[in-house]
Amino acid sequence: MAHEMKLQTVPHAGGVFGADVDPGIGGIGGSPDGPLNIVHVFWIAGMSCDGCSIAASGATNPSVEDLLLGRIPNLPKVVLHHPVLSPGAGTEFIRPFRAAMDGTLGAPYVVVLEGSVPDDQAFPTEFGYFSAMGAGGFDPESETDQPNRVTDWLWKLAPGAAAYIAIGTCATWGLSLIHI
Protein backbone atom coordinates (compact mmCIF):
# COMPACT_ATOMS: atom_id res chain seq x y z
CA MET A 1 0.00 0.00 0.00
CA ALA A 2 1.44 3.37 -1.00
CA HIS A 3 1.29 6.20 1.52
CA GLU A 4 1.83 9.87 0.87
CA MET A 5 2.48 12.55 3.48
CA LYS A 6 2.84 16.23 2.66
CA LEU A 7 5.11 17.60 5.35
CA GLN A 8 7.49 20.51 5.44
CA THR A 9 11.10 19.92 6.50
CA VAL A 10 12.35 22.39 9.10
CA PRO A 11 16.10 22.17 9.78
CA HIS A 12 17.42 22.39 13.33
CA ALA A 13 19.48 25.50 14.07
CA GLY A 14 22.59 23.35 14.24
CA GLY A 15 21.84 21.86 10.85
CA VAL A 16 22.22 18.30 12.08
CA PHE A 17 18.66 17.30 12.88
CA GLY A 18 15.48 17.97 10.94
CA ALA A 19 11.82 17.81 11.86
CA ASP A 20 8.89 17.25 9.56
CA VAL A 21 6.19 19.68 10.62
CA ASP A 22 2.62 19.81 9.40
CA PRO A 23 2.16 23.55 8.80
CA GLY A 24 -1.61 23.25 9.35
CA ILE A 25 -1.28 22.31 13.03
CA GLY A 26 -0.81 24.99 15.70
CA GLY A 27 1.33 22.45 17.50
CA ILE A 28 4.45 23.09 19.44
CA GLY A 29 4.61 26.87 19.64
CA GLY A 30 1.09 27.33 20.93
CA SER A 31 -2.32 27.84 19.43
CA PRO A 32 -4.96 30.53 19.06
CA ASP A 33 -6.47 29.14 22.29
CA GLY A 34 -3.44 30.12 24.39
CA PRO A 35 -0.07 28.76 25.43
CA LEU A 36 0.73 25.10 25.17
CA ASN A 37 0.96 23.50 28.62
CA ILE A 38 1.64 19.87 27.77
CA VAL A 39 2.97 17.91 24.82
CA HIS A 40 3.28 14.15 24.46
CA VAL A 41 6.40 12.70 22.85
CA PHE A 42 6.04 9.23 21.36
CA TRP A 43 9.57 7.86 20.99
CA ILE A 44 9.50 4.95 18.57
CA ALA A 45 12.48 2.63 18.21
CA GLY A 46 12.98 1.43 14.67
CA MET A 47 16.02 -0.60 13.73
CA SER A 48 18.77 1.01 15.77
CA CYS A 49 21.45 0.75 18.42
CA ASP A 50 19.58 3.03 20.89
CA GLY A 51 22.50 5.47 21.01
CA CYS A 52 20.20 8.51 20.94
CA SER A 53 18.16 7.14 23.86
CA ILE A 54 21.37 6.76 25.84
CA ALA A 55 22.55 10.25 24.90
CA ALA A 56 19.19 11.85 25.74
CA SER A 57 18.93 10.10 29.10
CA GLY A 58 22.45 11.26 30.01
CA ALA A 59 21.95 14.89 28.97
CA THR A 60 22.65 17.46 31.67
CA ASN A 61 21.85 20.86 30.21
CA PRO A 62 18.92 20.51 30.29
CA SER A 63 18.46 17.15 31.94
CA VAL A 64 15.72 14.79 30.86
CA GLU A 65 14.36 15.05 34.42
CA ASP A 66 14.00 18.84 34.13
CA LEU A 67 12.28 18.43 30.77
CA LEU A 68 9.82 15.81 32.04
CA LEU A 69 9.05 17.70 35.26
CA GLY A 70 8.32 20.93 33.39
CA ARG A 71 11.17 22.86 35.03
CA ILE A 72 12.45 24.54 31.85
CA PRO A 73 11.08 28.09 31.47
CA ASN A 74 8.86 28.78 28.47
CA LEU A 75 8.55 25.11 27.52
CA PRO A 76 5.46 22.97 28.03
CA LYS A 77 5.58 19.90 30.24
CA VAL A 78 6.68 16.88 28.22
CA VAL A 79 5.06 13.48 28.69
CA LEU A 80 7.58 11.01 27.28
CA HIS A 81 6.36 7.64 26.01
CA HIS A 82 9.63 5.74 25.56
CA PRO A 83 9.96 1.93 25.28
CA VAL A 84 12.76 1.85 27.89
CA LEU A 85 12.35 5.00 30.01
CA SER A 86 8.57 4.83 30.55
CA PRO A 87 7.40 3.36 33.85
CA GLY A 88 4.48 1.49 32.25
CA ALA A 89 4.64 -1.73 30.27
CA GLY A 90 2.36 -3.83 28.10
CA THR A 91 -1.16 -2.50 27.60
CA GLU A 92 -0.53 0.41 29.97
CA PHE A 93 2.40 1.57 27.81
CA ILE A 94 0.54 1.17 24.49
CA ARG A 95 -2.69 2.87 25.67
CA PRO A 96 -1.52 6.49 24.97
CA PHE A 97 -0.22 5.46 21.53
CA ARG A 98 -3.68 4.13 20.70
CA ALA A 99 -5.33 7.29 22.08
CA ALA A 100 -3.12 9.44 19.84
CA MET A 101 -3.89 7.19 16.88
CA ASP A 102 -7.64 7.46 17.58
CA GLY A 103 -7.56 11.23 18.17
CA THR A 104 -8.60 10.94 21.83
CA LEU A 105 -5.30 11.87 23.51
CA GLY A 106 -6.48 15.38 24.35
CA ALA A 107 -3.10 17.08 23.83
CA PRO A 108 -0.72 17.68 20.93
CA TYR A 109 1.96 15.12 20.28
CA VAL A 110 5.26 14.67 18.51
CA VAL A 111 6.62 11.42 17.11
CA VAL A 112 10.36 10.82 17.50
CA LEU A 113 11.82 8.03 15.40
CA GLU A 114 15.11 6.56 16.57
CA GLY A 115 16.54 4.04 14.16
CA SER A 116 15.82 3.35 10.55
CA VAL A 117 12.38 2.51 9.22
CA PRO A 118 12.14 -1.23 8.58
CA ASP A 119 11.31 -2.45 5.08
CA ASP A 120 8.52 -4.75 6.23
CA GLN A 121 7.13 -4.91 2.70
CA ALA A 122 10.04 -7.21 1.79
CA PHE A 123 8.24 -10.13 3.46
CA PRO A 124 5.95 -12.24 1.26
CA THR A 125 3.16 -12.40 3.89
CA GLU A 126 1.36 -9.87 6.05
CA PHE A 127 2.83 -11.46 9.18
CA GLY A 128 6.46 -10.54 8.55
CA TYR A 129 8.15 -7.79 10.52
CA PHE A 130 11.60 -6.54 11.45
CA SER A 131 10.63 -4.28 14.34
CA ALA A 132 7.41 -4.25 16.34
CA MET A 133 5.79 -2.65 19.37
CA GLY A 134 2.72 -4.08 21.07
CA ALA A 135 0.43 -6.75 19.68
CA GLY A 136 -3.19 -7.37 18.86
CA GLY A 137 -3.66 -5.37 15.69
CA PHE A 138 -5.08 -1.88 15.28
CA ASP A 139 -8.74 -2.79 14.90
CA PRO A 140 -10.55 -2.88 18.30
CA GLU A 141 -12.45 -5.96 17.11
CA SER A 142 -9.26 -7.76 16.11
CA GLU A 143 -8.43 -11.00 17.86
CA THR A 144 -4.96 -11.37 16.39
CA ASP A 145 -1.95 -11.99 18.57
CA GLN A 146 0.45 -10.74 15.90
CA PRO A 147 2.92 -7.94 16.72
CA ASN A 148 2.12 -4.40 15.57
CA ARG A 149 4.83 -3.36 13.13
CA VAL A 150 6.73 -0.11 13.74
CA THR A 151 5.98 0.96 10.16
CA ASP A 152 2.25 0.63 10.87
CA TRP A 153 2.56 2.73 14.06
CA LEU A 154 4.34 5.45 12.08
CA TRP A 155 1.55 5.59 9.47
CA LYS A 156 -1.22 5.46 12.08
CA LEU A 157 0.27 8.27 14.21
CA ALA A 158 1.16 10.55 11.28
CA PRO A 159 -2.21 12.25 10.64
CA GLY A 160 -2.49 13.79 14.12
CA ALA A 161 1.17 14.49 14.89
CA ALA A 162 2.25 18.10 15.33
CA ALA A 163 5.72 17.02 14.20
CA TYR A 164 7.78 14.00 13.21
CA ILE A 165 11.43 14.05 14.24
CA ALA A 166 14.02 11.65 12.87
CA ILE A 167 16.73 11.54 15.53
CA GLY A 168 20.25 10.27 14.96
CA THR A 169 22.15 8.88 12.03
CA CYS A 170 20.17 5.62 11.81
CA ALA A 171 16.85 7.44 11.41
CA THR A 172 18.12 10.13 9.07
CA TRP A 173 20.51 8.14 6.88
CA GLY A 174 20.23 4.49 7.91
CA LEU A 175 19.35 1.63 5.65
CA SER A 176 16.83 -0.78 7.06
CA LEU A 177 17.33 -3.69 4.67
CA ILE A 178 20.19 -4.49 2.38
CA HIS A 179 19.34 -6.73 -0.57
CA ILE A 180 22.29 -8.90 -1.61
List the model feature ranges, each with a label:
Residues I178-I180:
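Conserved small/polar residues in nucleotide/adenosyl-binding loops
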Residues A171-G174:
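Short gly/pro/ser/thr-enriched loop/turn and capping motifs at secondary-structure boundaries
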Residues F42, A163-G168:
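Hydrophobic/aromatic beta-strand patches that form the interior of the parallel beta-sheet core
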Residues M1-G27:
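N-terminal export signals
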Residues D22-G24, G29-L154:
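Extended, subdomain-level signal for the structured scaffold at the beginning of enzyme domains
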Residues W155-A161:
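Short, conserved loop/helix-junction motifs that constitute active-site signature segments
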